[in-house]
Amino acid sequence: MDFNQSPLLVIWEVTQACDLACVHCRASAQSRRDNRELSLDEGRQLLEEIKSFGDPMMVFTGGDPLKRPDIFDLLRHSVKVGLRTNVTPSATPLLTPAAISHFQDCGISRMAISLDGPDAPTHDSFRGVRGTFDTAESER
């Protein structure tokens, strides 16, 4: 393995906060933000350092990135420094048409939402909250 190569992909778990209770969650999701999360200024500095590695794809994930009030500032800065920027929000009531418009306005390359089953009972059981299948489907 050549550790002098630049990363192709950087995934930043910007928060552990999330309103879902997914059975597979690796983020140890909780309802509130952790006070150890990077500040907006620290996040901007991190993005600049990541860009100095080369041209990796940057993915903002969580928890739910929409639980961070400054997520759109971080996304805009990521695009501004020249990173190919993606976001993976949770399918919760925070994922509104206005939020999706804000993502577009930030200039992100891609947004992904998970579907964890062919129907609402399967998906919602996996996500731990009723109604998330319908939210995800409505944003197609």
Which functions belong to the PLM regions below?
Residues 23, 97, 121-124, 134:
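Alpha-helical elements of the RecA-like P-loop NTPase motor core of helicases
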Residues 1-110:
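Conserved alpha-helical substructure of the radical SAM core
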